[in-house]
Amino acid sequence: MNIFIDKNAKTTPTNFSWQFGVGNDHAFQMHRADMCEHIKLAHDELGFKYLRFHGIFDDDMLCVQRLSDYKPFRAVPHSKEIEEVNFLQVAKVYDNVLACGMKPFVELSFMPSALASGKKTGIRYLNNITQPKSLARWSDFIEKFINFLLRRYGKEEVESWYFEVWNEPDLAIFFKGKQQDYFRLYEATAR
């Protein structure tokens, strides 16, 4: 292959739109020091501004924990109904993103098992891709999440972030449902 560059041709300035952001697969990876080093390098050397990843609500992020998730307590009456909502692991991830000089591009996914209508998982890391069993409960969960972000990072900071409802709901490996199901999920999330 030969490449010819006409150095006398008219040029146009680059708009650097590619520097807007980069994807990083799974949120939990941002707990790793080596991943943070790579993301900081991407920011410092390439100018990326936002970082987007999947799975901030995956079970390994411990956002919703039920007493029944712990084997010794499964026999306790109503153990599935006793739960805690906690965004500490998500906060650690976002703290790391901000420490790298970037801002989060928040993908509101996937479904915590405690809120899920089923057990269908997507690719690799057991992300639950089902819809919530209760849209009202999901909406309440999202409201708690947004309030947590506002308390921790402040309104001005959070307003500088981008938010996305789910990841590629048109692909069966990421969302179990039809287009109308996604529209209902979106409406319940964006309230």
Residue spans for each PLM region:
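Non-catalytic accessory regions flanking glycosidase/transglycosidase catalytic cores in CAZymes
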Residues: 1-162, 180-191
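Aromatic- and kink-enriched transmembrane "portal" helix at the membrane-lumen/periplasm boundary
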Residues: 169-173
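Short, solvent-exposed loop/turn segments at secondary-structure boundaries
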Residues: 174-179
